Each structure stands twice: as C-alpha cells, then as structure tokens.
C-alpha cells in the first residue's frame, strides 16, 4: 500500500510540475534561495504535511460544513470549500515576516496548486494530497 501511495504521489507531483511549466510560458518563475540540501529536504516535507493539514484536512471540511449550514447544497459547499481553501492557501504565502513579496505569477500558481491539492484530497484522501505536495516541493526545490 505504501509503495503504491509513494508512486501515486510522485505521479501527481510530476503532473503539477507540468502545470507549473505550462504557466511558466506566461510568467517567469523566480528562483528560490540557496540552502543546504538536507535542510531544504526537511522543509519541503514539513511544508507539504503542515499545509495539507491546515488547508485541506481542517479548513476544507470546516468551510463546506459552514456553507452547508448557510443553506448551500452539498455540491456547492464542496466547490466553494475548494475555492476558498485554495484562495487562503495562496494568500498565506504572502503573510508575515517570512512571507514572499506579492507576485501575480506565484499567487496564481499557488491558487491553482491549492485547487489541485484540494481535489486530490477530496478524491484520494489526505495521505495522497500531503505526499504529492511534499513530492512536488522536493521535485522543484531539489532537482
């Protein structure tokens, strides 16, 4: 089971890299800061796990529940939960002292990536979403 999950996470990460490359045709991608390999590896694993817990495992169901209580149909609540959690996921990358300077390219890509991970979470579950997020971060940050 774990080997299958690992392969699937790698597959989804490669798909998201392809989306990033496609978007890169329209906007140049800023280069990241140089750090040690091990510290970047740990940071990428941690970011994938932490962000998926916060934005998909906790926020998405909370948004869907709240919207359903306000009268939204289950389908509409799910769609708006994906949209809202993706928007907040993107915004969160620009907040605080370690936040990035706002850039339309990275904002758009992070919003799309948030939607990508949200759909993965809804269809395949937390493990695949978190693993794919960590694998994507490692692919673009270490390779």
Please provide the spans of the model-predicted regions.
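Transmembrane helix-loop-helix hairpins at the membrane interface
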Residues: 37-143
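Juxtamembrane helix-loop-helix connectors linking adjacent transmembrane helices
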Residues: 1-48, 64-72
């Amino acid at each position: 089971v774990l080997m299958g999950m690992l392969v699937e996470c790698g597959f989804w990460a490669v798909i998201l890299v392809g989306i990033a490359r496609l978007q890169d045709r329209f906007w140049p991608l800023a280069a990241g800061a140089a750090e040690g390999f091990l510290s970047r590896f740990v940071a990428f694993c941690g970011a994938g796990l932490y962000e998926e817990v916060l934005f998909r495992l906790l926020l998405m169901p909370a948004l869907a529940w709240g919207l359903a209580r306000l009268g939204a149909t289950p389908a509409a609540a799910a769609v708006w939960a994906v949209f809202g959690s993706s928007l907040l996921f993107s915004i969160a990358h620009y907040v605080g002292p370690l936040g990035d300077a706002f850039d339309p390219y990275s904002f758009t890509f992070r919003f799309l990536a948030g939607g990508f991970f949200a759909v993965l979470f809804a269809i395949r579950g937390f493990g695949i979403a978190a693993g794919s997020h960590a694998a994507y971060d490692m692919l673009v940050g270490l390779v």
